[in-house]
From Swiss-Prot:
Gene3D superfamilies: DnaJ domain, HscB, C-terminal domain. One of its GO terms (cellular component) is iron-sulfur cluster transfer complex. One of its GO terms (biological process) is [2Fe-2S] cluster assembly. SMART domains: DnaJ. This is Co-chaperone protein HscB homolog. The keyword Chaperone applies. Residues 2-74 form the J domain. InterPro entries: DnaJ_domain, HscB, HscB_C_sf, HscB_oligo_C, J_dom_sf. Keywords: Chaperone.
Amino acid sequence: MNPFNIFDLPVDFHVDQATLSARYLALQKSLHPDNFTTHSAQEQRLAMQRSAEVNDALQILKDPILRAETIIAIYTGEQQNIEENSTRDMAFLMQQMQWREQLENIEAQQDSDQLVAFSADIEQTQQALLSELADALSSQQWQQAKVINDKLRFIKKLLLEVERVEEKLLDF
């Protein structure tokens, strides 16, 4: 399934979200079950399946990590294996450990001001990586794009941990 084809969009990391939303609504309207009440059971099933594909494609195109993986797969034919592709960048591995330790300390100290600053730093890193990823994809540097995408996957998980700590601190 090529999510770009489903929405009739060019294969590009930068997706116009307004166009994507408009096309999503049009597709979902055309596939609405009410439009198939007089059709055969098979046609109804196919419409439901197509609707599910549209939903899956939307999720891929809205998530920059999944969108990048899809672009890489389209151009290289390679599917990314998350378990197999942990980053070998030692500096980034050390940074990951440092961030986790820093987050643990913030949680132990229950310091919401430090958490806000930490979160802002991580989000800034995420934005820089997204920019690097866009550049790598546009210049078709697939291996570099994979490495950056792995880093973004870690950042995404770390930001979820930050949210968990934030919720915990708010309960106090």
